[in-house]
Amino acid sequence: MNWQERITADPAICHGRACIKGTRVMVSVILDNLAAGEPAEAVMRGYHLQREDVEAAVAYAADLARETVIPFIPGVA
């Protein structure tokens, strides 16, 4: 999945946050919904997205996870 084909960031739209191209749907909103257990189909219906948009959001997050290390505090669940 080449997420660059479906995701863009424009300072004039949603404060420059990553969004699905041609929309104001932020990638973080898609990921928040999926992380909360919302089925991909429900996210697609709720935000008028295509499956490829949701897949691009996940691929974008995967790339970020490979690039960014978030320190974990021992003993904190």
Regions found by a protein language model. Give the residues of each.
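Short, Lys/Arg-enriched anionic-surface-contact patches
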Residues: W3-V25, I73
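Short amphipathic alpha-helical surface micro-motifs
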Residues: M1-W3, V54
